[in-house]
Amino acid sequence: MSKSYDWSFNSAQKPNSKLMLWLYNQYVLDCPVKGVSARSCDFSTLGWSGHSYLTLASAMKSESNLANQTWRYVKDAELNSTLRELGVFNKYTLDKELCVYAKGDKQKVEGLFYMIRNALAHGSFRYHCTKTGEYLVMQTSRNGKLRGRAVIKIDTLKRWRSLLNNRRKYLK
C-alpha cells in the first residue's frame, strides 16, 4: 500500500529556491487567467479562446496522467463528495495525479490555473521528491471553505506552461 499524507501545509516542505522561483514566475506572476496578474498575457492573448480551450484541455490531459475521473471541475456542493469518492478527502497518495476543484466563474482550464496560482500565492502547497518524480500538492479555500485540491507532477506543470506558449503545435 502506498504511503498516505494529510492535507496539511503547516511547515510543509518547499521546492529548492530555483524551482520555487520558476513556479512563482510561471503560475503566480504569469498566471494566464484574465485580470489576475498585471504582468501576464491572458489565455486569449496567447491564442487560446473559444473552441481552442477544448484543444488546450485535451493537450493538458495528454501531457499529464490526468483522466476524466481525476480531473474534476465540480459544483461547490459536490466538491467534498467527489474528494471522498476518489478517496482523497482526508489523505492523499502520490500514486496518481489529480485535480478536483469547484466551478466558479471561470472555464475549466482557467479554473485550474487559478487554483494553482492561489495555492502557490497563499502557501497552501507541499513539495514531494520521490523515486517516481517530484510532486506539488496543493489546496485552495475561500473564507475557510475548501475550493480545490490537486496532486500534480512538477514535470506536468512544466509541460503545461510550455504548451501554453506553443499553441501552433496543437492548433492545426
Regions found by a protein language model. Name each.
Residues 1-133, 138-172:
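Amphipathic alpha-helical interface elements
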